Amino acid sequence: MEKISRTKIVDLLKRRDFGAMVNVKGWVRTRRGSKQVNFIALNDGSTINNVQIVVDLANFDEEMLKQITTGACISVNGELTESIGSGQAAEVQARGIEVLGTCDNTYPLQKKGHTMEFLREIAHLRPRTNTFGAVFRIRHNMAIAIHKFFHERGFFYFHTPIITASDCEGAGQMFQVTTKNLYDLKKDENGAIIYDDDFFGKQASLTVSGQLEGELAATALGAIYTFGPTFRAENSNTPRHLAEFWMIEPEVAFNDITDNMDLAEDFIKYCVQWALDNCYDDVKFLNDMFDKGLIERLQGVLKEEFVRLPYTEGIKILEEAVVKGHKFEFPVYWGVDLASEHERYLVEEHFKRPVILTDYPKEIKAFYMKQNEDGKTVRAMDVLFPKIGEIIGGSEREADYDKLMTRIQELGIPMKDMWWYLDTRKFGSCPHSGFGLGFERLLLFVTGMTNIRDVIPFPRTPRNAEF
């Protein structure tokens, strides 16, 4: 076959130089036709849209054509022509076809509907479906938007360690990292494992957050963000939890809680606008196939100012809802860590727009959050979204050395793990704020998917680490 430079299908479908000879490569989605002419729907992953290849059967070897089945990979030389059918403006009249890879008849992605559960079992193949092709192209574009947003605002991208000795959230649900022989663990007289002879000379884990290290950078570089994988060993088999996921964590020197809320709202709106501007075909496909209100919901976020609501006021609204007969599975009272059903009631039923909940009780939030003058609450903020619940968690950080030290001692956090963090309050402490956004939570909102396992290529969940 004549050598012609390949054109990606996303670019080919925009061309109008009909009569030009082109080359496309991709995977066969469908093949149909008559005894004289076949029509092949070809996709190369660059777009949700297929290009139609028109094949005059008289011009091609019958044995070669038998190899062109759903899933086969082919290279096509042909003439770009104006399509007479509806759906797209251009198609390719095949002049030469090369089969690059045949597809066994056990190929599981045939032309029929597949359940999400089934597709999770074949995660190595599901990017070839329309749905997951769309999701993963959107995922790429959201990552680009994140870097672009922060770069345009003078933030520095800061890399924090994956292996750490600190537990930022204090949850203790961390994956251990060790080179020790698990069948011959040395223990002290109290039964605790001795790590002195381990690789790092101490107990080490996979990070649950890059925040603490990010704070160190913010107190030197001014404004930074992290974007990387994090790990939580929570035994939670829900549509909202993963053991391995990606986090975006900006930290900004001299920002107070109001600045932090402004940044969070601007950031989310930027990402949503980017999706609509750069991934519209994919978003439209997901809107039409799975969630008829997706585009309307995305556009609604851009139009509305986020409600800013103190936790105490939120509790009052929820208590009033209970009095009026609304049934919650979990109880509502001041001091409770709100469940997803509470968050979604505030967003979806009461305000009908995103809510930033602030000033949470000190006892249900992390040690590093700045305490309010009432002594009971901290300058925390959670951004709550429709269908998702919490999408961002953040706070103004405690900048006072003595208050931070007292809180660390109250919670029994070992000083040997925190001395370096306290140094930032000892040497030129400054007000600063930040937040964490779960990348996959953002993707749930932008794609309309209902299970977080469907917005990451290879989900890691309890008892599941395939591929």
Swiss-Prot record:
InterPro entries: Aa-tRNA-synt_II, aa-tRNA-synth_II, aa-tRNA-synth_II/BPL/LPL, Asn-tRNA-ligase, Asp/Asn-tRNA-synth_IIb, NA-bd_OB-fold, NA-bd_OB_tRNA. GO terms for molecular function: asparagine-tRNA ligase activity; ATP binding; nucleic acid binding. Its EC number is 6.1.1.22. The keyword ATP-binding applies. GO terms for cellular component: cytoplasm. Gene3D superfamilies: Bira Bifunctional Protein, Domain 2, Nucleic acid-binding proteins. It is found in: Cytoplasm. Keywords: Aminoacyl-tRNA synthetase, ATP-binding, Cytoplasm, Ligase, Nucleotide-binding, Protein biosynthesis. Pfam families: tRNA-synt_2, tRNA_anti-codon. The keyword Lipid metabolism does not apply. It catalyses: tRNA(Asn) + L-asparagine + ATP = L-asparaginyl-tRNA(Asn) + AMP + diphosphate + H(+). GO terms for biological process: asparaginyl-tRNA aminoacylation. Belongs to the class-II aminoacyl-tRNA synthetase family. Homodimer. PANTHER family: ASPARAGINE--TRNA LIGASE, MITOCHONDRIAL-RELATED, ASPARTYL/LYSYL-TRNA SYNTHETASE. This is Asparagine--tRNA ligase.
